[in-house]
Amino acid sequence: MDIYSTLSHEKENLVPINENRINMFVCGPTVYDDAHIGHGRTYVAFDTIKRFLEYLGYSVFYIQNITDVDDKIINRSKETGISTTDIAKKYEKRYIEDMNALNVNNVNLFARATDHMAEIIDQIERLIEKGYAYETEDGVYFEIAKFKDFGKLSHINVDELQSHRELAKSTKKNKNDFVLWKKRDDPSEPRWNSPWGMGRPGWHIEDTAITEYYFGSQYDIHGGGIDLIFPHHEAEITQMEAVSGKSPMVRYWLHTGFLMVSGEKMSKSLKNFITIRDLLKDFDGDVIRFFILNKHYRSKIDFSHKVLVDAGKGLERIKKYYELVSGQLADKNSNATADYELVSNTKKEFIDCMSDDFNTPKAIASVFKLINESKKDILDEKLNESELAAIKGFLDDVSYILGIDFQQKQDSSKDKELFDLIADIRTELRANKQYELSDKIREKLVDLGYEISD
């Protein structure tokens, strides 16, 4: 199993700290608004990564943080007059609903920042004790000059840095020192008591406090969008390795590529984003997920409705093939031993692709290759029970790994509309004394397994 790590800029063999246990952390949402499809791209990718690692036999514990205290939440509260707590609760709930719609349901623990304030304060205290952080009149800052490896993830030259929007404070020793704790006097804003007075944590310290509490100072995989490499993930490494004295903090850093719209990155700041919730009005969650997985997680994705429509057509091919195989197998001995050389070769190809840095597009291509090479024989009923069972078993594995249900979904509301239409047609036929045609329609419906009573 080879994984591309942003830290080394090369593929590395997966060697967990503990032999069969993998601890994985992915930066979760700041809950002040609905998640957009760019967020969905990241979380579908890591959900699939966990699924495949578990398929290989690893035990994976996956944590995602929830940033429920942040300037964006506070600003939204001031705009709407709704409390920061209620805003965070509302959008956390909606985020979970959106993830469930995309079948992203393998996170073992959602860790809220506000539930880990003691751990955050403790980590800041230890950074001060070790000489890496200092207090000013407006907060506590990490002194990056004290950490010689700052920039090793992003490969950014510290001397050439422009002051980041969140970090520009005149009270800092260096313009690039980043905030660990923000002192706040305004009682209308969320704040907690600390050794440095009332205030709230900076963004970066939340994640390292959470991961240290659950995983210790070193763990296996940290993931997120490529836009988080700097300053966020760089700051995480700086904090954790400084406070623990251990390196590396994380063995494998994985980052998803941008989702693009008309050549620009999809983002809320550019106001060119499409929420998952809105997209689900036009496309099934399985189609959205299939669209995402048709690109490698590290590559850019160009978003358009046409690409989603095309993804839907591709997924429909797989679903119809699965239905064909399942139907023929049901007519035979569905408990037959699975054995088919074509499937064995395809399965090896699929696993090899996924083992090469989770290459989902190539893995999916192997499934279409199987369809192309076997469908005619299935239609001609040339495959025996064991061969059909092998195909179905493989497709069931693929379904689990990709997190996509290959069974055709029945839309009961549309079914009712169709049957009402058929009933109206038959009523009109009988009124015109076309009894033979009406009865023929009835017989065909019965043959298809529907109960019709006149």
Please place each PLM-identified region on the residue numbering.
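N-terminal, positively charged nucleic-acid-binding surface of large information/translation enzymes
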Residues: 8-11, 17-103
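N-terminal, positively charged, Ser/Thr/Ala/Gly-biased leader segments
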Residues: 97-133
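Short phosphate-binding/catalytic loops that engage adenosine nucleotides
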Residues: 58, 132, 450
